[in-house]
């Protein structure tokens, strides 16, 4: 056991039994790094992060790796939801040096906390090779790492001066955005698709044009009908691993859901529609159902259960075939878009096709929920984050106004 056993954070407690001598971020431990002249390994993640859990199991439980880290580094673990300020600093570093980032965010710092390297997920052998190289460089030629860090800081300062002097303006011109947006599947062009609620909010309030309206409709359609939405329990997953929005990365984050409730509600309010009321209602009901005893909304729901990533959400093809009748199976195939892109290893991930037969809907949904009820529900991180709860309160108010539901307000 290490000192993380005393952590309030569920994410940090997951690492309490690691053989690594993980420390909290504190003035005392940072002073120790300077006194002992040791590099710092800073590892940042959060409770719902699938790859954080994988690296914890594969890499941070490894005795050989732990011994090397304990002897040669100061090892610090951070929950990004507890220290968004620190996470922001080192996420900026990886974005500036590599162009992309994510979690787990694993950094190597000089004893004075200046970064010299940042990466994300590493298998055990790759991680050991990486930290061994940096240990050797720092031992034999520390000036090389110090110079690199100094150059990065100078570059960052110059970049900030440029940003302050530039007069960039947000443009509503479709032509200027066209190279960044996906006209085939909606959203921002990327191999992975994030809902990007702030971008959606920006689009909603743009002057109406046929091109923008068509793009917004396509984006909202795929966000509410494809794999990023959970049509049984309600709620949105964090992102999809493919550009077509078919298969999600299965954690649910409060801040995403809160903002998407606002986006969909405001879209309907502006357009004088009730197009997304069922999605909004189901999502609100889901988050209310898992609200903590102290009346706060939890920060996230894990991607994993005992069956692995998305284990709670996947439906085995043979199990569905036994539970549903032939007619129910035919209906489910249409209603939940059960086709080849959503089938992996004889397991379905269901979508939210708005094709609904009232007579069959309740029966089929109830049976599918029963299948889920026999699985362990993913871990809920009951950490109450004030700003995210405020986002949800805003979402409830927006929904209440848009759909004239006083219970939400």
Regions picked out by a protein language model, each given a short descriptive name:
Residues 1-402:
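Replace the tail clause
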Residues 405-409:
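Short, intrinsically disordered, charge-balanced linker/junction segments flanking boundaries
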């Amino acid at each position: 056991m290490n000192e993380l056993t005393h952590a309030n954070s569920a994410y940090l407690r997951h690492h309490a039994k690691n053989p690594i001598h993980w420390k909290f971020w504190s003035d005392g431990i940072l002073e120790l790094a300077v006194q002992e002249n040791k590099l710092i390994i800073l590892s940042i993640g959060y409770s719902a992060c699938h790859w954080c859990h994988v690296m914890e199991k594969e890499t941070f439980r490894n005795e050989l790796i732990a011994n090397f880290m304990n002897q040669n580094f100061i090892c610090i673990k951070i929950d990004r939801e507890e220290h968004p300020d620190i996470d922001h600093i080192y996420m900026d570093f990886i974005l500036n040096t590599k162009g992309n980032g994510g979690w787990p965010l694993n950094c190597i710092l000089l004893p004075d906390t200046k970064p010299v390297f940042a990466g994300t997920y590493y298998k055990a052998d790759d991680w050991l090779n990486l930290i061994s190289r940096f240990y050797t460089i720092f031992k034999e030629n520390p000036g090389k790492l110090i110079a690199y860090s100094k150059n990065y800081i100078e570059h960052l300062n110059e970049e900030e001066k440029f940003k302050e002097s530039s007069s960039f303006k947000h443009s509503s011109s479709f032509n200027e955005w066209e190279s960044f947006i996906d006209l085939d599947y909606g959203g921002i062009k990327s191999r992975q698709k994030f809902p990007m609620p702030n971008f959606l909010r920006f689009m909603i309030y743009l002057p109406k044009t046929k091109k923008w309206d068509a793009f917004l409709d396509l984006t909202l359609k795929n966000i509410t009908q494809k794999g990023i939405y959970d049509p049984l329990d309600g709620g949105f997953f964090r992102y999809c691993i493919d550009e077509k929005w078919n298969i999600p990365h299965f954690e649910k984050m409060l801040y995403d859901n809160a903002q998407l409730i606002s986006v969909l509600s405001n879209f309907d309010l502006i357009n004088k529609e009730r197009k997304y009321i069922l999605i909004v209602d189901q999502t609100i009901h889901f988050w209310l159902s898992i609200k903590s005893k102290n009346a706060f909304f939890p920060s996230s729901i894990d991607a994993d259960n005992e069956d692995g990533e998305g284990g709670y959400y996947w439906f085995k093809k043979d199990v569905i075939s036994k539970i549903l009748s032939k007619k129910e199976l035919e209906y489910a195939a249409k209603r939940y878009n059960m086709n080849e892109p959503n089938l992996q290893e004889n397991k379905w991930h269901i979508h939210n096709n708005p094709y609904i037969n009232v007579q069959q809907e309740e029966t089929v949904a109830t049976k599918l929920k029963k299948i889920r009820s026999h699985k362990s529900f993913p871990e809920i991180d009951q950490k109450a984050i004030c700003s995210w709860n405020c986002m949800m309160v805003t979402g409830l108010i927006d929904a209440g106004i848009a759909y004239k539901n006083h219970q939400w307000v």
